[in-house]
Amino acid sequence: MKRKVLVLGAGIQGCCIALELANRGFKVDLIEQDSVPFNRSSIRNEGKIHLGLVYINDTGFETPKLMLKAALRFAPYLSRWIGIGVKDLNVGTPFYYLVSNQSFLDTEQLEQRYHQLEKLYCESTEKESFTYLGYKPDKLVQKSSEENLAKHFNTDCLQGGFYTSELAIDTSKLAEHIRKAVKKHSNITFLGNHRILGISKNGSGYIVEGEKNRSNWKKKSLQVVNATWTDKFKLDETLGISTPKEILHRLKYRVIADIPEEMKNFPSATMVIGKFGDVVIRPDKTAYLSWYPDACRGWSNSIEPPESWNEPSRGIVPKKDFDEISEKLIRETEKWYPAIRNCTPKIVDAGIIVAHGKTDVDNKKSRLHQRSKIGVTSYGGYHSVETGKLTTAPMFAMDTADRAEKIYRQL
């Protein structure tokens, strides 16, 4: 069948691609190793829809440009597939960007670069009608006074800070809506618990092979999309596609906690630039928090992450690890955000981050400060997607669908 596509991986990227292809009339088999869609790294993160602020150390400015472009398209594209407003995604309060005393860019340097991003934002919104999560902020960033910062943060840790328009969504809410959309679409067949082992060329098409419940399975199609995130490079290699240098997988833990009523309108915050952390305050009186030095507990330059990372990335964490990790992350976070001491942890889990680099984020020259060489690469009817960030997934889904349409017209 010409209008049939196999989409491998049912995280946010694979689901968005499947939904867009299905809307265009393609029949899609959405193949996933887990029992349900959207149950691994896509859900186990802070949900930030990046405006480019955290990647401001990219001296070529390519990453901030890409993130801003993707952020302005995130909600409009998502609404094509799940048909809801942003308010249904439990959006957190706007972020303060707090400049640590240990930041390798000082407040003045950051202000100059944020001004450059602000200019780019103004140019973008003049040319296009896209909004940021349903809003059209007058400004992305404003420098904050020390008096204002001191209302919520320990300014002894800081050299300055900025109030921003950046927001985070609740990934668990997004997962609920994505799963419903996938389940009800008549053009999508979800194949869960299907481990994918390899891909091979088959005439003008492809064969995807794998395992389910100790039995082998095989699927054929003229077009295949690799949106597997952690297995992307391994599967690319089975087709003879060379693996890029300096692949890096990191395992980063997070805590979701209950907060008291009086905190529900407190600001969200990101500390920059280096090995620091984030807090997201949500309207349902929960908070996301992470502190990188204690949260990043896995580092691998192998082509795929270690098998031992599988359970925490599915939300399975032993009680002793739950207690130890939550205690550490809360203790370290309350040093700069004192009210966090009043929270009660309810979830501890981890997401796998796929990037490129040898050195960590506290190195000014680390490749981790760049995330622009990502997106879709096509080899005939095989489309391999390096998502990069949650923010960019809907935009790359549209690109992938456009490529699939083009290939279909050539068949």
Which residues are covered by each model-predicted region?
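Flavin-binding catalytic cores
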Residues: 117-121, 285, 296-354
